């Protein structure tokens, strides 16, 4: 049965980065079967696409305040993977992540409704984002969940999945995203995500009573992700305070 921390992690990551793009190989494929999924198989690929590239660009930019996302590079999902839709000047990269950015055990791994706007800073764009971009290529080429997991395990064994660089973080402040069927309205809370080499959650006080930070550390991956809710969405409107 899914724990409250697992639910919180799924709402926040999508992410994934669920966070598999963000935290590759969170769990084995058999764990996905332990939770009865409403999405046991991938939907037709068209259901994962956004009809208008302009709409996808706007949704991606909504992940962070305009002062950050406006001059950021934007990637949108094409036929075979993500493609550059807008060049950037500040080192940030904004995308709309799909459901396969979640952990392998996530019951919503194939949820075609998920749209998770994220803006990565330069460090995470170099060291965290590429794992998700590669996974997307596998999905669009028709890979199954088991094949994706096997390839990820092989990449980990070959040390092709790097540790996050120092200072790696991203913004998830969009009011318009859909992170999970379980999240209220689909978009949970505006939050920042910090990626560090695998470490104990207690080093940040994550998950302790009253602590405004949560964390997730996969069993196989080299990444620990910390989530810090903030008080406003990217458009400046206030968010409902989170109960600690």
Name these PLM-found stretches:
Residues 33-244:
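Primary mode marks residue(s) on the alpha4-beta5-alpha5 output face of response regulator receiver
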Residues 26-33:
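Sec/Tat signal peptide C-region and signal peptidase I cleavage site
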Residues 1-4, 55:
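A general, composition-driven signal for non-globular sequence regions
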């Amino acid at each position: 049965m899914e724990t409250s921390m697992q639910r919180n992690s799924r709402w926040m990551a999508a992410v994934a980065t669920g966070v598999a793009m963000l935290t590759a190989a969170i769990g084995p494929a058999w764990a996905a079967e332990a939770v009865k999924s409403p999405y046991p198989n991938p939907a037709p690929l068209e259901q994962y696409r956004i009809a208008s590239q302009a709409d996808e660009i706007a949704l991606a930019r909504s992940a962070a305040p305009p002062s950050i996302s406006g001059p950021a590079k934007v990637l949108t999902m094409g036929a075979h993977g993500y493609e550059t839709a807008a060049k950037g000047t500040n080192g940030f990269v904004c995308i709309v992540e799909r459901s396969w950015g979640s952990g392998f055990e996530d019951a919503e791994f194939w949820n075609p409704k998920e749209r998770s706007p994220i803006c990565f800073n330069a460090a995470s764009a170099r060291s965290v984002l590429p794992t998700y971009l590669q996974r997307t290529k596998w999905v669009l080429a028709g890979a199954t969940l088991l094949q994706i997991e096997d390839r990820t395990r092989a990449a980990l064994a070959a040390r092709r999945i790097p540790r996050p660089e120092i200072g790696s973080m991203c913004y998830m402040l969009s009011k318009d995203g859909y992170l999970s069927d379980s999240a209220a309205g689909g978009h949970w809370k505006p939050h920042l995500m910090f990626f560090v080499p695998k470490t104990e959650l207690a080093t940040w006080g994550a998950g302790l009573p009253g602590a405004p930070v949560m964390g997730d550390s996969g069993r196989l991956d080299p990444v620990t992700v910390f989530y810090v809710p903030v008080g406003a969405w990217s458009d400046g409107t206030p968010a409902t305070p989170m109960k600690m």
